[in-house]
């Protein structure tokens, strides 16, 4: 807890100077003079994903042919975010390579606004309007000069770049097909009006990944509120597995706030790597589930795919446009491939135990036709007699069709005389499980008719019920 508190203090110091930067910008210029466009547009190739070797120059038609732009294919426009170094970050060529691997005949354009992006954050935040204006004028020129269909255009913006993409989409003559916001920046944009930030109106379809929304609104690195048609919050959107808070604090303590970018990079940049994962692992897309809150999701209450309640994360997302933004959640692994398998578990505790047990630790093991996943930890905030509890667990491997499960109640880490003298226990007759990825429901019965789950003792074993009446699921 102290580490988390220190992290928030550090971020607070870093963000304290951020004040709203109000820089107006006119609608995309319909004139033919493009000399004032400062952003550069590099068409990278599958052979050289790391270098800007050929630039498309608005107003110069020859530059488009010289770069071998494919007029019959999709175009991806990648817009980077704020930078401390003034150089491209390592994710840029990785995303370019993944896009080309998935769509070999496409055009992948990288927008260079590095000079504007390396200014003091509020200044760079204000520049997103100018960058968006540059991008819109470039797209409009391509459409007017070459009759290039904007239905083939997909903008991908990271951090501040997501808002630049939104501004661009709002200023094009026709709507572009899609904008993907990769953890859009929060400071200066959380309370901004739609014209100056990413919003659902900026493209035919807008999907957003939120991966670092830790902190109070307006001061979190990534924007917290939904800003697309579908907004996905992996691992609740606050912090990502594998991103070490303690290590980040140690780096800041040793090197100062100059390395604050290292603090935000892991979770903030995870949005990009999740999207890259969706490009490279198309056969096994991660599944996200619509839910009113991350708390409800953690209880396993949202693993439904009825009426578009679930969707694929990333490139193969289903373009669902509801009147209100859909907030969706999922769990992920700490590294690629990020896909996990979600399960809702419902257990009814009965017996003669008096009172409530608070913050109780358990372990559950699942055994299937393909593999097994053992000793998955979970904690129930409270446990009492004659109540049913629902919670979410997930496995990092596909275990196939569920066959058996074990449940263990972990003893407290501290010594307790009552537990030593007589361990509390509950009676469990059956456990209900729903698999999110397959939507299958299974009821498990105690192997010995009823199972006595005792704290700190052996696991209780449950097998699939054979009574047909039980398979009507609940």
Swiss-Prot record:
Listed GO CC annotations: catalytic complex; cell surface; chylomicron; extracellular region; extracellular space; plasma membrane; very-low-density lipoprotein particle
SMART domains: LH2
Disruption phenotype: Mice are born at the expected Mendelian rate. At birth, mutant pups have threefold higher plasma triglyceride levels and sevenfold higher VLDL cholesterol levels relative to wild-type. After suckling they become progressively pale, then cyanotic, and die at about 18 hours after birth. At 18 hours after birth, their plasma triglyceride levels reach 15'090 mg/dl, compared to 188 mg/dl for wild-type. At the same time point, VLDL cholesterol levels reach 280 mg/dl in mutant pups, compared to 6 mg/dl in wild-type.
GO BP, one annotated term: positive regulation of chemokine (C-X-C motif) ligand 2 production
Main location: membrane
Domain of life of the native organism: Eukaryota
Residues annotated as glycosylated: 70, 386
Bilayer topology: Peripheral membrane protein
Cross-referenced PROSITE patterns: LIPASE_SER (PS00120), PLAT (PS50095)
Location of the protein in the cell: Cell membrane; Secreted; Secreted, Extracellular space, Extracellular matrix
SUPFAM superfamilies hit by this protein: alpha/beta-Hydrolases, Lipase/lipooxygenase domain (PLAT/LH2 domain)
Record region (Important for heparin binding): 430-434
Disulfide bonds: 54-67, 243-266, 291-310, 302-305, 445-465
InterPro entries: AB_hydrolase_fold, Lipase, Lipase_LIPH, Lipase_N, Lipo_Lipase, PLAT/LH2_dom, PLAT/LH2_dom_sf, TAG_lipase
Record function comment: Key enzyme in triglyceride metabolism. Catalyzes the hydrolysis of triglycerides from circulating chylomicrons and very low density lipoproteins (VLDL), and thereby plays an important role in lipid clearance from the blood stream, lipid utilization and storage. Although it has both phospholipase and triglyceride lipase activities it is primarily a triglyceride lipase with low but detectable phospholipase activity. Mediates margination of triglyceride-rich lipoprotein particles in capillaries.
Complexes and interactors: Homodimer. Interacts with GPIHBP1 with 1:1 stoichiometry. Interacts with APOC2; the interaction activates LPL activity in the presence of lipids. Interaction with heparan sulfate proteoglycans is required to protect LPL against loss of activity. Associates with lipoprotein particles in blood plasma. Interacts with LMF1 and SEL1L; interaction with SEL1L is required to prevent aggregation of newly synthesized LPL in the endoplasmic reticulum (ER), and for normal export of LPL from the ER to the extracellular space.
Family membership noted in the UniProt record: Belongs to the AB hydrolase superfamily. Lipase family.
Protein name: Lipoprotein lipase
Organism of origin: Mus musculus (Mouse)
């Amino acid at each position: 807890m102290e580490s988390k508190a220190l992290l928030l203090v550090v971020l607070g110091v870093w963000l304290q100077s951020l004040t709203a930067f109000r820089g107006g910008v006119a609608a995309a210029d319909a004139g033919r003079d493009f000399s004032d466009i400062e952003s550069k547009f590099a068409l990278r190739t599958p052979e050289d994903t790391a270098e800007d070797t050929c630039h498309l120059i608005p107003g110069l038609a020859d530059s488009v042919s010289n770069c071998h732009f494919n007029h019959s294919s999709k175009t991806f426009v990648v817009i980077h975010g704020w930078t401390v170094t003034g150089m491209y970050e390592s994710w840029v060529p990785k995303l370019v390579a993944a896009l080309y691997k998935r769509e070999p005949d496409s055009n992948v354009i990288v927008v260079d606004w590095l000079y504007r992006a390396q200014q003091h954050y509020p200044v760079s935040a204000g520049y997103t309007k100018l960058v968006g204006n540059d991008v819109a004028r470039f797209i409009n020129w391509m459409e007017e000069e070459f009759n290039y269909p904007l239905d083939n255009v997909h903008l991908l913006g990271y951090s501040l770049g997501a808002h630049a993409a939104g501004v661009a989409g709002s200023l094009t003559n026709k709507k572009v097909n899609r904008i993907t916001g990769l953890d859009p920046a929060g400071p200066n944009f959380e309370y901004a009006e739609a014209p100056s930030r990413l919003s659902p109106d900026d493209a035919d379809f807008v999907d957003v990944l939120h991966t670092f929304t830790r902190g109070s609104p307006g001061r979190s690195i990534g924007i917290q509120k939904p800003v697309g048609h579908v907004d996905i919050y992996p691992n609740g959107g606050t912090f990502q597995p594998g991103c070490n808070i303690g290590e980040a604090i140690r780096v800041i303590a040793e090197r100062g706030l100059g390395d604050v970018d290292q603090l935000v990079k892991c979770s903030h940049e995870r949005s990009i790597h999740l999207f890259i994962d969706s490009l490279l692992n198309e056969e096994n897309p991660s599944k996200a589930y619509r839910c009113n809150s991350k708390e409800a999701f953690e209880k396993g209450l949202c693993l439904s795919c009825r009426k578009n309640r679930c969707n694929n994360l990333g490139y193969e997302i289903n373009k669902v446009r509801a009147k209100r933004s859909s907030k969706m959640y999922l769990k992920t692994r700490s590294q690629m491939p990020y896909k996990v398998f979600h399960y809702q578990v419902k257990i009814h505790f009965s017996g003669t135990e008096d009172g409530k047990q608070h913050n109780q630790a358990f372990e559950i093991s699942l055994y299937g036709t393909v593999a097994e996943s053992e000793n998955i930890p979970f904690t129930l905030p409270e446990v009492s007699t004659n109540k049913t509890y629902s919670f979410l667990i997930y496995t990092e491997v596909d275990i196939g069709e569920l066959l058996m499960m074990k449940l263990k109640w972990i003893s407290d880490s501290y010594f307790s005389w009552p537990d030593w003298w007589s361990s509390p226990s509950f009676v469990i007759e059956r456990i209900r499980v729903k698999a999110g990825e397959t939507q299958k429901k299974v009821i498990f019965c105690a192997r010995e008719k009823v199972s006595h789950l005792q704290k700190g003792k052996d696991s209780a074993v449950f097998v699939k019920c054979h009574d047909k009446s039980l398979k009507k699921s609940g």
